[in-house]
Amino acid sequence: MKDLTIRRLRPSDAEALYRILSDRQVMRYLEPPYDRLQTEQFLREAGLAEPPLVYGTEEDGRLLGYVIYHAYDPDSMELGWVLSPDCWGKGYASRLTDRLVELAHRAGKTAVIECVPEQTVTRHIAEKKCFAYVGRTDGLEVYRLPPNE
């Protein structure tokens, strides 16, 4: 596989982001699909925020989606991913999880993944990467990577 880049989102990513966030399959467990205005608002409030809550991920200059990477609590970073359907089942989410865990560890933090119970792929990746299920918060299942994993 080629190298994945994690980078700051840019205003010019709005159209590619819209194609992803307007897809019903992508948004199935998140929210109703976004229209252009909602996509632009999300980009402003989450991607262009300081510090960002999400970052773009690309391969060969093509935006594949975004990763979630922001403070969850004083000791942890929340991480996750939202990817174009053509990236599903190809190991992208697993590779991105490894990269984000590495970033969190370099910052002296551990990592947390939250998902709805129906997100079996997310749960599978969390478990495969040695995240421990720690309970539910606001209807979301919470997985935490033990320190030094």
Question: In which residue ranges do the predicted regions lie?
Answer:
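Juxtamembrane/interface motifs at transmembrane-helix termini
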Residues: 36-40, 48-50, 84-86
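Sparse recognition of residues in long alpha-helices and their boundaries
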Residues: 33-34, 54-55, 142
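Acyl-donor (CoA/ACP) binding surface of acyl/acetyltransferases
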Residues: 1-15, 19-25, 57-149
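Secondary-structure transition/capping residues
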Residues: 28, 37, 50-54, 111
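Charged, low-complexity, helix/coiled-coil-prone segments
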Residues: 38-45, 66-72
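Conserved GNAT-fold acetyl-CoA-binding loop/helix
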Residues: 25-44
